[in-house]
């Protein structure tokens, strides 16, 4: 451990702050690096980003480690944001956080860490690594089940995991804040960031409309009867209730409407009434662009658990790997609001096997 150099991604939040502190306490040679991934385009966002940088700098000064900044805005635009726009244009709902981990934090940043002569990269993710009996590295759920972030990390392979440390993966979130407070880190009570990394807290619709032209269209019920108008299919996600703008439809009960399907060919959004409407449920899905943590699927056909969204409880299923590398997943119980563009991630107990993109 002595003299092993660890470069920590410091975001200005409490998780990465405590990660850096713990590594320093464990005797590593630690450097904190702030990654700038987005050129702010409004004043509020600029102020928020400036605050994050100031907090990151303050934390590093307080711990007594060097602080650096690196700009990945070009890489982010090319490898994350453009893909994000293509997916939305195609009517799917992508997960940019997964792509950001794959392309920026564990690729561009990892290359930068090598340039700095770092032995390891560290982040404030709630995840763990474990050495398996065969010598491979497993990606394991964080101890705090409510905060586990392996769903966003399933694209990581052996090479990346061997060079990665997750210092807070075996700690509860409440304890992380406690450690920050005890050590007088300015971020101890900073609220967790929400929203997509580059949009921050802004209104999603407003943001997307700056980059993609929206085409308005009709909203139909499951029988093809027009019940309203939509602002553009890209603004809606399967299972969504808020913002459909359907209210008081003649001769219909006062039951909430939910987005159930996108008819891209005719630019029609299909909506149904009731949270548990059968059209919102599916028992199977197909996924492409598979990533397996171990480098390959466990078998051509296997049983495991899966999540189709972050923080969903593990769902029992059977996975069949096709010759082209895609998978068919059949769940024991029908799943609500399976969303094309989102990821399905597979687990056996607390080990993340990998995942893919739902089509």
Swiss-Prot record:
The lineage of its organism: Bacteria, Pseudomonadati, Pseudomonadota, Gammaproteobacteria, Thiotrichales. This is tRNA-specific 2-thiouridylase MnmA. One of its GO terms (cellular component) is cytoplasm. It catalyses: S-sulfanyl-L-cysteinyl-[protein] + uridine(34) in tRNA + AH2 + ATP = 2-thiouridine(34) in tRNA + L-cysteinyl-[protein] + A + AMP + diphosphate + H(+). InterPro entries: MnmA-like, MnmA-like_C, MnmA-like_central, MnmA-like_central_sf, Rossmann-like_a/b/a_fold. ATP binds at residues 9-16, 35, 124. GO terms for molecular function: ATP binding; tRNA binding; tRNA-uridine 2-sulfurtransferase activity. Its main location: cytoplasm. Keywords: ATP-binding, Cytoplasm, Disulfide bond, Nucleotide-binding, RNA-binding, Transferase, tRNA processing, tRNA-binding. It comes from Francisella tularensis subsp. holarctica (strain LVS). Disulfide bonds join 100-197. It is found in: Cytoplasm. Residues 147-149, 309-310 are annotated as: Interaction with tRNA. Coiled coil: none annotated. Residues 95-97 are annotated as: Interaction with target base in tRNA. GO terms for biological process: tRNA wobble position uridine thiolation. The active site is at residues 100, 197. Belongs to the MnmA/TRMU family. HAMAP family: tRNA_thiouridyl_MnmA. Its EC number is 2.8.1.13. It is an enzyme of class 2 (transferase).
